[in-house]
C-alpha cells in the first residue's frame, strides 16, 4: 500500500502553498502550522513532510521552532527539508524533532557533506530530494536550474547508499492537474528497488491510485488537501 505523506510548507511561521515553486504565488492557509498538523494526526496521518521555504531561500535552517512545536505536540513522523546546508543545520533539525531530513540542493552544491550525512546517519534518516524542471535538477528553493539530469542524478546517489528519493516535477507542483506518472514509471523501470516518493500535482484520489499502480512507495500531498480536492477521511483507505 502506498504511503500517504502530507505536506506543510512554512513561510514566516505560517502554513502556505506555492504554485510551481514561485514565491510570488504564495497562498496562506493557516497562521498556525501546528493546528494543521494536529488535524492531520486526528485523521490518522502518520507522516509529515515539513518544508522550510524561508530556509530554502536563505540557505540555512530558519523555521526550526515550528518543527520543534509540531514534534513536541504530535506523534507525527516528520521529515524536514529546506535550507539544510551544513552539519549544524542538520543537528538543529534532528534536535528539534525531525526523524528524517531531505537534502536536495546540498547533494548538488556540496556532495561531500551530503555523503557524510548518509554515512553518519544512515539511509533511513537521509532522503534525497530530486526536484526537476524539464528533467533537469533545480536547487535553492527551485530558483536555480542545473545541468544535472534527473535519472543520472538519482543513479549516482543510489550508489552512495541513498534508498529513499522524493521526486518533484516542479511544473506540476501546486497545479492540481495530475502527477508526472510517466516520469516516475521511467525511474522505477531503471531501478525497481528504489523507495520512490512522488510529489507535485496530486489532485484527486485517482491520482494516488495511479501512482500506487505504477509502483510508487509513497506520495506527498499538499494543495489538494488545503483546497479540499481530497478530503482527509478519503485517505483512511490507504492506512496512512
From Swiss-Prot:
It comes from Azobacteroides pseudotrichonymphae genomovar. CFP2. One of its GO terms (cellular component) is cytoplasm. Belongs to the HisA/HisF family. GO terms for molecular function: 1-(5-phosphoribosyl)-5-[(5-phosphoribosylamino)methylideneamino]imidazole-4-carboxamide isomerase activity. HAMAP family: HisA (MF_01014). Keywords: Amino-acid biosynthesis, Cytoplasm, Histidine biosynthesis, Isomerase. It is found in: Cytoplasm. The gene is hisA. Its EC number is 5.3.1.16. It catalyses: 1-(5-phospho-beta-D-ribosyl)-5-[(5-phospho-beta-D-ribosylamino)methylideneamino]imidazole-4-carboxamide = 5-[(5-phospho-1-deoxy-D-ribulos-1-ylimino)methylamino]-1-(5-phospho-beta-D-ribosyl)imidazole-4-carboxamide. Its main location: cytoplasm. GO terms for biological process: L-histidine biosynthetic process; L-tryptophan biosynthetic process. The active site is at residues 9, 131. Pathway: Amino-acid biosynthesis; L-histidine biosynthesis; L-histidine from 5-phospho-alpha-D-ribose 1-diphosphate: step 4/9. This is 1-(5-phosphoribosyl)-5-[(5-phosphoribosylamino)methylideneamino] imidazole-4-carboxamide isomerase. InterPro entries: Aldolase_TIM, His_biosynth, HisA_bact_arch, Isoase_HisA-like, Isoase_HisA-like_bact, RibuloseP-bd_barrel.
Amino acid at each position: 500500500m502506498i504511503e500517504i505523506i502530507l505536506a506543510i510548507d512554512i513561510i514566516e511561521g505560517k502554513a502556505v502553498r506555492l504554485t510551481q515553486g514561485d514565491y510570488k504565488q504564495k497562498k496562506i492557509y493557516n497562521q498556525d502550522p501546528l493546528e494543521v498538523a494536529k488535524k492531520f494526526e486526528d485523521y490518522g496521518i502518520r507522516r509529515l513532510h515539513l518544508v522550510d521555504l524561508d530556509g530554502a531561500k536563505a540557505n540555512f535552517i530558519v523555521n526550526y521552532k515550528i518543527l520543534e512545536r509540531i514534534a513536541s505536540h504530535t506523534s507525527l513522523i516528520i521529515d524536514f527539508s529546506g535550507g539544510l546546508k551544513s552539519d549544524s543545520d542538520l543537528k538543529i533539525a534532528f534536535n528539534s524533532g525531525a526523524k528524517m531530513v531531505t537534502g536536495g540542493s546540498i547533494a548538488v552544491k556540496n556532495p561531500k557533506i551530503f555523503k557524510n550525512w548518509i554515512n553518519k546517519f544512515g539511509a533511513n534518516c537521509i532522503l534525497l530530494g530530486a526536484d526537476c524542471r524539464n528533467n533537469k535538477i533545480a536547487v535553492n528553493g527551485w530558483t536555480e536550474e542545473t545541468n544535472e539530469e534527473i535519472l543520472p542524478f538519482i543513479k549516482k546517489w543510489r550508489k552512495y547508499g541513498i534508498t529513499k528519493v522524493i521526486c518533484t516535477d516542479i511544473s506540476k507542483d501546486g497545479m492540481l492537474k495530475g502527477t508526472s506518472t510517466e516520469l516516475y514509471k521511467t525511474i522505477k523501470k531503471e531501478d525497481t528497488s528504489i523507495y520512490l516518493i512522488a510529489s507535485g500535482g496530486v489532485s484527486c484520489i485517482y491520482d494516488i491510485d495511479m501512482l500506487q499502480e505504477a509502483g510508487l512507495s509513497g506520495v506527498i500531498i499538499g494543495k489538494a488537501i488545503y483546497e479540499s480536492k481530497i478530503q482527509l477521511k478519503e485517505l483512511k483507505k490507504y492506512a496512512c
